[in-house]
């Protein structure tokens, strides 16, 4: 039995070798220039879902009530300071005779 000489390259001739190498180089360029197909961006954030407008409105109303009460308290303290905090301790009550 005679052995068939094996080629060191799998190509039978140079034209086939060039075609294989060109195809391989084209494949490598495509792999190198490939763009990802998976969308890795975070989802859009909708402001009307993140901001609770009803809650903000309720908080604003609560703060306006607090501001009004603070203003009234300030007026009372200012009037007390103006009169030096004096109170009328006199009792002008006259007893009735029965």
UniProtKB/Swiss-Prot annotation:
Tissue specificity, per the record, is:
Expressed in a number of tissues including brain, thymus, lung, heart, liver, spleen, kidney and testis.
Task: Determine the domain of life of the protein's source.
Answer: Eukaryota
* Coiled coil start-end: none
An example of a Pfam family matching this protein is: Hmw_CFAP97
Query: Which family would the database say this protein is a member of?
Result: Belongs to the CFAP97 family.
Q: What is this protein called?
A: Uncharacterized protein CFAP97D2
Tell me the organism.
Answer: Mus musculus
